[in-house]
């Protein structure tokens, strides 16, 4: 959510952000509703003053006729106030709805575009493997190495669920421990977060839980949702608090993630790439306004360190305006090389990191005191450390060998306890 004074003072900038994101939003309607809301509040104040004056007169020693007149006036004022308060409630509801739809402004260096083709490639890192044999995709490897079972999961839970088996279980746990240890070494406080959040927290982070395109599951007959990312629960940790930001507060959260992924059934979404449930380690930071861009770049650097140590080839993208979620001021993606992607190999997203400035903290009322003792809204930065399913794809497909097995990246061996997954007949 943006500051309304900022919107009024920077109307053209806000409109350009809306247009660049491909959104349809009438910002002038928001201004109209705000003006109307203020006028109603003023009228209510005036009527309350008249009502108080009328009540004061009634306490005086009056003749019967004048007292009856004041009683009737009091009834009229009461009815007018009720009508105005009901109108204020309706207008405020519409105002809040429109206000929440306004996206964050864009960083000046965000590429303007209308598809993922307009994302700007910053760099490529690592050597794409060349095989002397026909490489398998992760589904074939998962079958031949007895690591994955989608068929039984489909019977038990439905499509886009899966069982991890045997070495894949230890590989997932190794990835979690590897990333959490790295983040702890870098000064992050480590959490296992709830997998459930209340609606006002989900909404405050910038997800639209009631929208037609909502990607998260609601728990029936409650105000709670299964989280699609621990960004939600980490971001809500300091809801309605004034926090000490002498130093940035860096948090690392492990959680399960649940997503509907409606309609995601194409070739590029097969197997583990797009599923209803997966495990993830998330980075999160609360910081001062002047620190968020630095923290954002730091998060990207940590992500690069992780995938460099995992020896996975990747590329870094500066995400274009059309692909940004409403809270994001700027976003980087890292895409890993996946030899089995689309039958010929390609890059697929494995992490992202977003600087959301004070967009989320305004909704969640998370503040800090600046050097002058004034309350300011904290800036909030998030980023994926490890989303296990997609990293497992990358490891299986990049580290397969001619024997049909898969080597384990050296940085993970101390966590897995083995350095090779053999072919199983």
UniProtKB/Swiss-Prot annotation:
L-serine binds at residues 229-231, 282, 384. ATP binds at residues 259-261, 275, 349-352. It is found in: Cytoplasm. Belongs to the class-II aminoacyl-tRNA synthetase family. Type-1 seryl-tRNA synthetase subfamily. The gene is serS. It holds the Pfam family tRNA-synt_2b. This is Serine--tRNA ligase. Keywords: Aminoacyl-tRNA synthetase, ATP-binding, Cytoplasm, Ligase, Nucleotide-binding, Protein biosynthesis. Homodimer. The tRNA molecule binds across the dimer. One of its GO terms (molecular function) is ATP binding. It is an enzyme of class 6 (ligase). It comes from Borreliella afzelii (strain PKo).
């Amino acid at each position: 959510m943006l500051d309304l004074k900022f919107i009024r003072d920077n109307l053209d900038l806000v409109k350009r952000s809306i247009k660049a994101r491909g959104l349809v939003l009438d910002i002038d309607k928001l201004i109209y509703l705000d003006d109307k809301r203020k006028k109603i509040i003023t009228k209510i104040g005036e009527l309350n003053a008249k009502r108080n004056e009328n009540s004061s007169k009634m306490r005086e020693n009056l003749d019967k006729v004048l007292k009856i007149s004041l009683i009737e006036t009091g009834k009229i004022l009461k009815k007018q106030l009720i009508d105005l308060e009901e109108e204020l409630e309706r207008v405020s509801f519409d105002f809040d709805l429109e206000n929440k739809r306004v996206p964050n402004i864009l960083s000046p260096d965000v590429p303007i575009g209308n598809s993922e083709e307009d994302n700007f490639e910053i760099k490529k890192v690592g050597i794409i493997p060349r095989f002397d044999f026909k490489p398998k995709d992760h589904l074939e490897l998962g079958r031949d190495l007895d690591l994955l079972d989608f068929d039984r999961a489909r019977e038990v839970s439905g499509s886009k669920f899966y069982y991890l088996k045997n070495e894949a279980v230890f590989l997932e746990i190794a990835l979690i421990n590897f990333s959490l240890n790295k983040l702890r070494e870098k000064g992050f406080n480590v959490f296992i977060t709830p997998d459930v959040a209340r609606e006002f927290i989900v909404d405050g982070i910038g997800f639209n839980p009631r929208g037609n395109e909502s990607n998260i599951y609601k728990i029936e007959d409650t105000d709670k949702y299964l989280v699609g990312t621990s960004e939600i629960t980490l971001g809500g940790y300091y809801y309605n608090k004034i926090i000490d930001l002498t130093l940035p507060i860096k948090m690392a959260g492990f959680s399960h993630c649940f997503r509907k992924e409606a309609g995601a059934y194409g070739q590029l979404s097969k197997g583990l790439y797009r599923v209803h449930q997966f495990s993830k380690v998330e980075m999160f930071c609360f910081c001062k306004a002047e620190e968020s861009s630095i923290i954002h770049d730091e998060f990207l650097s940590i992500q690069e360190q992780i995938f460099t140590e995992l020896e996975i080839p990747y590329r870094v993208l500066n995400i274009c305006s059309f692909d940004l979620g409403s809270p994001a001021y700027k976003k980087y993606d890292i895409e890993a090389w996946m030899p089995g992607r689309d039958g010929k190999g390609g890059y697929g997203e494995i992490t992202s990191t977003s600087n959301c400035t004070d967009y989320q903290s305004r909704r969640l009322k998370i503040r800090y005191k600046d050097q002058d003792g004034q309350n300011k809204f904290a800036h909030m930065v998030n980023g994926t450390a490890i989303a296990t399913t997609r990293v497992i794809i990358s490891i299986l497909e990049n580290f397969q060998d001619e024997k049909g097995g898969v080597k384990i990246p050296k940085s993970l061996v101390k966590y897995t306890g083995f350095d090779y997954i053999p072919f199983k007949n």
